[in-house]
């Protein structure tokens, strides 16, 4: 009994795959349509964003003569997480807003800032994203300056070195056009396939001789040909 059921499932899956193959041009059309929508969205709807990055290097205040050991490096990496919180603190953000005369709240500025710590180092990268490339550079440097001042005040660290000042981005960092087009293509192909599969599963029409035998539980004696096709 289970063998018969498994055979029926295999036949149904095979028939379903055949139906999908017959609809391959429709699936491709929908996928291309969604990919085109992703391209249109990336080019004409989303505002391009530019990212400027600056990096600082922080010395552990408890390190004598600025000598660095493996233990100091590990401790410094943990302290870097504290510095990350300081950089994104409200005091730092408000100072940047005041110095740059920004007309939006600190919460909005925070969304533009990304702080990352290079693994097993004391190097902290501060990136700022903005629709204006010059503004992204200006904000990155302003955040760095305000953050350095705050870190010194809170941790009593005096040795903070600027490794890189904020660069002037020449190309937008987002949107990622290729990624959006690819996502659109995959989503379009996936959605159209799912819809066709559901339609195939719900389709209980009798289309073949085998369907008639299953529906009536009788053996077919023959097929009456369509005279119009002879």
UniProtKB/Swiss-Prot annotation:
One annotated GO biological process: capsule polysaccharide biosynthetic process
Pathway(s) where this gene product acts: Capsule biogenesis; capsule polysaccharide biosynthesis
Main location per the UniProt record: membrane
GO molecular function: protein tyrosine kinase activity
Subcellular compartments: Cell membrane
GO annotations of cellular component type: plasma membrane
Alphabetical keyword list: Capsule biogenesis/degradation, Cell membrane, Exopolysaccharide synthesis, Membrane, Transmembrane, Transmembrane helix
Membrane topology: Multi-pass membrane protein
Function per UniProt: Required for CpsD phosphorylation. Involved in the regulation of capsular polysaccharide biosynthesis. May be part of a complex that directs the coordinated polymerization and export to the cell surface of the capsular polysaccharide.
Homology family: Belongs to the CpsC/CapA family.
Name of this protein: Capsular polysaccharide biosynthesis protein CpsC
Higher taxonomy: Bacteria, Bacillati, Bacillota, Bacilli, Lactobacillales
